[in-house]
Swiss-Prot record:
GO cellular component entries: cytoplasm
GO function term, MF aspect, one: translation elongation factor activity
Residues with N6-(3,6-diaminohexanoyl)-5-hydroxylysine modification: K34
Protein name: Elongation factor P
Functional note: Involved in peptide bond synthesis. Alleviates ribosome stalling that occurs when 3 or more consecutive Pro residues or the sequence PPG is present in a protein, possibly by augmenting the peptidyl transferase activity of the ribosome. Modification of Lys-34 is required for alleviation.
Cell inner membrane in keyword set: no
Length: 189
């Protein structure tokens, strides 16, 4: 596996630290007036999700993590596991609630998601940035009911709840940003 020196550190780089795969969230090069230069690095443990800060002297190196991001198709949830399939090889992977996490509320069957694999097993699931989901439950919007800024809560087909404009009703399909959970607009169908 490749090794990365401190001058190669950048956001998103995946390295091994204390036996666990980690991702660099932030990297700051510091050159004090006196003493040796160093990197102040904010890292996220890909297994536990814990984020912490650590400093490395200039010239130190870390081993690259055997972590691969692959596009996969979400198949189904059997109550305990979420199942994903590699489109080229048709190889299937399954992840539990700790792997899927908050992404579960944005997963729609047949959607393409990014699955992070470590030693052949899923570590994390990243949904697409924008998804189209159907509204299954929302209050009817009454004319003149804009005391709250013109939005109302709506439950989507995956169970996620988002704020939508008053003119939308049950059965309509909307586009949602999965990173922020915000309504983007009606889906073009």
């Amino acid at each position: 596996m490749a090794t990365y020196s401190t001058n190669e550190f950048k956001s998103g780089l995946k390295v091994m630290l204390d036996g666990d795969p980690c991702s660099i969230v932030e990297n700051e090069f510091v050159k004090p007036g006196k003493g040796q230069a160093f990197n102040r690095v904010k890292m996220k443990n890909l297994k536990s999700g814990r984020v912490w800060e650590r400093t490395f002297k200039s010239g130190e190196s870390l081993e690259g993590a055997d972590v691969v991001d692959r596009d996969m198709q979400y198949l189904y949830n059997d109550g305990e596991f979420w199942h994903f399939m590699e489109p080229e090889s048709f190889e299937q992977f399954q992840g539990d609630a700790s792997v899927v996490g908050d992404s579960a509320k944005w997963l729609n069957e047949q959607d393409t998601v990014v699955v992070t694999l470590y030693n052949g097993s899923p570590l994390a699931v990243t949904p697409p940035n924008h998804v189209e989901l159907e509204i299954v439950e929302t209050d009817p919007g009454l004319k003149g009911d804009t005391a709250q800024g013109g939005t109302k809560p709506a439950t989507l087909s995956t169970g996620a709840v988002v704020k939508v404009p008053l003119f939308l009703s049950t059965g309509e399909t909307v586009r949602v940003d999965t990173r922020t959970g915000e309504y983007l607009g009606r889906a073009n169908k």
